[in-house]
Every structure is written in structure tokens, then in C-alpha cells.
């Protein structure tokens, strides 16, 4: 992403400079420990790893809609029922499955990761400020990858019924970021 995460220009040339957020120290980890997944890594995680479809599911966690990702060697904690997959209903996160704070704590301790359906900051191409708005909060998630497709960026997109890679976004859109580190 760019060096200024709150920058809202709709001019492509303004986003030529890439900033490696991995140089920032997080929780005392050395610099260059954390990074953003590539589109290929998102694709592997969501679709291509063994048993990928069984290792993700939409849910509402503590009244927040989102997508849960599970590790390869995941074992479901006792007294928790996890249903993998997507809902057949638009906005059906809570109808599909819901977890309390205590249940989520147990899931998280077992390696589960939650991606909130945080929507995105929309800045329509060719339209001047102040047209910025937030869109899709609690409806869909859109997460940057570190991969480009020409002048655009590739992202992970999900809602309650669908998940996919290659949702192409112009750089002025404000998407969520999930940092990862090698273990």
C-alpha cells in the first residue's frame, strides 16, 4: 500500500510509491516480520490447500459478521460446533452460525482467524472529493493483497454467500489489511 494510508487521491500516479509496512515493529517482533499476503497466497489459503473448503466458514462473532479461517491441522474445541462453508442467504452470517465472546476465545486459541466484514472506503474513479463514503460494513469484507494487476490491486472479497480472489480495486479505495508472519 502507499506510505499514507489515509490518502484519497483518485490519480493513479499518486500511488506509485509502495511502502513496506513490514518494516514496522509489531508487538516487539523484529522489523520485516509482518507482511500482507499475495493474491497467490490468498488463493491457496481459500481454495487450493488440502481440505480448503472445510477450513473456512462465514459467521457472526460477538455480533460482528465475517469469515473464519482455520489452520490446516485444526481440531474443533469441545462444546463448539463449527459449520464450514458459506450461507445461502444474503446477509445470512448470523443465520448460518454465531459465536459468543467465550466461544470465539476458544476458537481463537485453537488457531481460528476472523476476518470482519468491514466493507470498504469507496472513492469512485474520476469523481473529486468529498465523495468518499463507507460501504458494505457488516455486509462484505474486502482485503488487500500485495499483488497488482496493471494499475489496479488484487484483493480478497467475501460476503455471506461467496468468497473470491481477484476482486480488482483501484488504489484509492480503502480496503482492510490482514498482516501475517512466518512461523
What is the role of each PLM region?
Residues 23, 35-183:
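C-terminal, surface-exposed recognition/capping segments
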Residues 1-32:
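Short, surface-exposed beta-strand/turn modules with glycine/proline-rich turns
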Amino acid at each position: 500500500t502507499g506510505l499514507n494510508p489515509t490518502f484519497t487521491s483518485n490519480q493513479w500516479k499518486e500511488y506509485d510509491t509502495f511502502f513496506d509496512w513490514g518494516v514496522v515493529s509489531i508487538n516487539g517482533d523484529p522489523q520485516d516480520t509482518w507482511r500482507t499476503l499475495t493474491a497467490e497466497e490468498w488463493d491457496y489459503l481459500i481454495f487450493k490447500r488440502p481440505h480448503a473448503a472445510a477450513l473456512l466458514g462465514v459467521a457472526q462473532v460477538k455480533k460482528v459478521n465475517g469469515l473464519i479461517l482455520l489452520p490446516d491441522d485444526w481440531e474443533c474445541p469441545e462444546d463448539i460446533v463449527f459449520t464450514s462453508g458459506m450461507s445461502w442467504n444474503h446477509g445470512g452470517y448470523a443465520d448460518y452460525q454465531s459465536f459468543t465472546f467465550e466461544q470465539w476465545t476458544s476458537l481463537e486459541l485453537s488457531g481460528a482467524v476472523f476476518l470482519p466484514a468491514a466493507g470498504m472506503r469507496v472513492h469512485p474513479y474520476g469523481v473529486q472529493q468529498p465523495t468518499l463514503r463507507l460501504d458494505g460494513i457488516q455486509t462484505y469484507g474486502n482485503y488487500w493483497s500485495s499483488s497488482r494487476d496493471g494499475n489496479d490491486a488484487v484483493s480478497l472479497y467475501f460476503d455471506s454467500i461467496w468468497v473470491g480472489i481477484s476482486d480488482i480495486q483501484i488504489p484509492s479505495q480503502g480496503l482492510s489489511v490482514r498482516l501475517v508472519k512466518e512461523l
